[in-house]
Every structure is written in structure tokens, then in C-alpha cells.
């Protein structure tokens, strides 16, 4: 069969490879001039920067894409596990290193607060049990009809997840120490949610880091995009770049998706898998006579969106890789207040920031004697933060100064401004324009209880035959391992339909 995949981000690349490995003719259409989507790369002034995701968690999910296609993952990506997850800075003289080794972890916890290990381990155990339930009964399955969700098994297993509790509540149930609470709560921002609003299940990230480890891909995270692109090439997939999709064509008589309009041309296909940002697709790519019924264009703005980010890619003329970790977090003096600012639409003058220094793990990513630094500052998305004008150069200059001041609170970056030789920024406006991410959201639809599992945009269209959706705003959600899972379960359903002649 001839299959179209819209979008050459990690979801589209993984899905296309899986389909092609089953013997089908696959074409990927990508609007930009390179593959990767949000898993993008910037090469500038001799530095190589990952532009989007940077942390490799759940490596088996990465490997599975290649092995499921009959290939050896080691021929495409080079993975290695990190001994230390990150350094965390609470203030200038207060730094802790978070290890994966349990003995070292205990020492770290006890140094923060004697006796805190028991509560922390109880938290990890509870979350791991919830994760296994969620993975088996909710995350790794699709919901094609109401009875797939509304049944006794889902009711019983869902009750065990205690989804009405928020992430903050679960953390505070086990952890009394404010520093350790910050360590756990901050990571919900990795998928763009407010720990006060996100279901308690979304406190799984620290557990995943501890249980499965954190890894690094040689060449940076973009090495995964390159590996997937090579996998697709080896499987005979055709990737068309600079291919802007104008519309998904719906046959009004048979209510099926049978073509796409791309760069002015109508291209016929047997099935279409769309991995572009779902809200933008529902708003702009469906014909007027054939909207997605649950998500018509006029309702898209009313959905809840994850936060965005202001990113800086900084090159400095000194090598500091022996003084920092690969991953680093510098906390705001008012962590809870900063969270409120992000989700209430206000800019912070004292943000918590994430700092990634890729040359710590791969020297080839920066010129000799120099260091590339990636800084992420969570911000409101464009709807909640409608009063923020990201096109205002004076504003972006002010935010850069805020970030440089925050970096300068740790010793290694005290004099960073005098060493800058390269600087690039990426704003919420850029997320919207470059990736068609609605409201510049960095992680798609926010996974609130009302926008999760059965209540999230589904992988198989309920309105039109031969139309499928995958990606961060669809089930099961955002984050690289999760969108790779989205690709897998969506392709599994497509292959079942093909085998049944549906």
C-alpha cells in the first residue's frame, strides 16, 4: 500500500520506518528543509547545538524502533549511560550532584536531610507501581471506541493511579524537605505541565531517571534524528523536504482520507498518518466540510496547552567542560512563585533554568578550547502569555540579561558575558512559526486529566477512514519516549486495519 506520513520529526520518522518494514511504500512530507522536527540541530560558529530535547530517558524505547524494523540499533545510534544525572544549584554555594547509583543517592539525600531516604524510596516505589499500571493498561494501547476505555479493567486499574491527585500532592505526601520537593517537581516541566495541575502520574520522570538511567547519544540528541533518517533510507522510504501540506483531502462520499495537497499538487495515498502538531492540523489542514468533529477549528483555542520556552544557544571561548555536568539545573530563589508565573502568563525576573553542555559528553560538538551552552527558560505559551511581545527586541534583550545574571550565580559562569563568541535565541514565536506548534507550546496539549488517555486526541480517526494521528498532542502524550510510543501504537493499528482490509 501507498502510505503518506506528514512530518519528519521523531514521531514521523519512527512511524514511517515501522510501516516500511512491513513492506509498504512510504513517503514522508516535511515542511522544513531538514528532518528532526523539534529534535533539531543548529550549527553555528563551529559549535553544534541540539535545539530541542536533550535528555535520553528510557533508552529501550529508542532501541526498539530499530530492532522492530529488523535492524541493529548500534548501527544507527551510539548510546552510553551517564553516572550522574545532573548538578542542581539552589544558590551560589549550594550545589548537589544527583547520581544514579543507589548508594551515592542515599548519601546525597542524607546530606540534604538526615532520614529523607526512606520517604524518597517510598515515593519511587509508589510511582514505579503507578507507571507499570499506566504503561500496561493505558499508555501502550489505543482507544478506538468508548468500550476500550469505559470498562471494568480500566476502572479498577485507573483507581490505583489516583489520577485526581496532582503531582505536587504525591510528592509532598512522601517528601517533607523543600529542596528534595523541588528536585522532583521541577521535572514535570520537562513535559510542560504545572505540578499543581498535572495528574500525579506525571511525577514519573525522576523515577524513570533513577530506574532506567539517563543516557547520551553520540553527536547529541540530533544523532537520533539522523539515525532514524538513515533507517528510513535503508528501508526505502522517500523523504520529501520543503513539502508544505496545504490540506488533507477527504472523500465526501466514502468519508475517507485519500490524498493530500502538498505544494499545490494533489497526491493520492491509501492511508495517511499525520504527525504534525494536532491542534494546528485540526485548525488548518482539514477541509471546511470535513472537520475533526470533537476538535473543530473554533474550539482549538479553548484547549489547554503546555508551557513554552525561551532558549539560548551560547558559544564561549573557554573550555569549562571539566567544571560542569552535561545536565544542570539552576533554581529560582522562589521556585513556587516561578511556576505560578509560567502558568499565569507572566515573565520571571528570577527563573529556574536548565543548562545543557553537550561537549561534556562529546568534544566534537564544540571547537577545541571552547564550549557550547544550551539554556532553557520555561515561559508561558502564547495564549496564556498574550501580553508578552516576543518580537520586541528590547524585551528579548532583557530576558537574555536575566539569563546571564542567573548563569553568573554559579562560579563557572560568573564571567560568562566576557567570553561569548556566539549567541542565538529561540522564542515561543519561533516554536509556532518553525514547527506550527499552536500558541508556541513546546510540548503540545497539556496532559491534564481532561486531556489524557481517552480524552486526548486519538491515534485512529473516529471521523474518517484511513486517517491516523500521532505525536505530542495525541495519545499518549509528550516527551521523546512517549511520542515514540505514540508512533508504535498508531502503526500497530494501521497494520491491523490493512490486514483486515479496513
From Swiss-Prot:
Keyword Cell wall biogenesis/degradation: no
Pathway(s) per entry: Carotenoid biosynthesis; staphyloxanthin biosynthesis; staphyloxanthin from farnesyl diphosphate: step 2/5
SUPFAM superfamilies documented for this protein: FAD/NAD(P)-binding domain
UniProt catalytic activity: 15-cis-4,4'-diapophytoene + 3 FAD + 3 H(+) = all-trans-4,4'-diaponeurosporene + 3 FADH2
Record InterPro entries: Amino_oxidase (IPR002937), Carotenoid/retinoid_OxRdtase (IPR014105), FAD/NAD-bd_sf (IPR036188)
Organism: Staphylococcus aureus (strain COL)
Gene Ontology molecular function: any one: 4,4'-diapophytoene desaturase (4,4'-diaponeurosporene-forming)
Any Pfam family hit: Amino_oxidase
Record: residues binding FAD: 5-17
Function: Involved in the biosynthesis of the yellow-orange carotenoid staphyloxanthin, which plays a role in the virulence via its protective function against oxidative stress. Catalyzes three successive dehydrogenation reactions that lead to the introduction of three double bonds into 4,4'-diapophytoene (dehydrosqualene), with 4,4'-diapophytofluene and 4,4'-diapo-zeta-carotene as intermediates, and 4,4'-diaponeurosporene (the major deep-yellow pigment in staphylococci strains) as the end product.
Protein name per Swiss-Prot or TrEMBL: 4,4'-diapophytoene desaturase (4,4'-diaponeurosporene-forming)
UniProt xrefs under Gene3D superfamilies: FAD/NAD(P)-binding domain
Keywords: Carotenoid biosynthesis, FAD, Flavoprotein, Oxidoreductase, Virulence
UniProt-listed Enzyme Commission number(s): 1.3.8.-
GO biological process: carotenoid biosynthetic process
Oxidoreductase keyword on record: yes
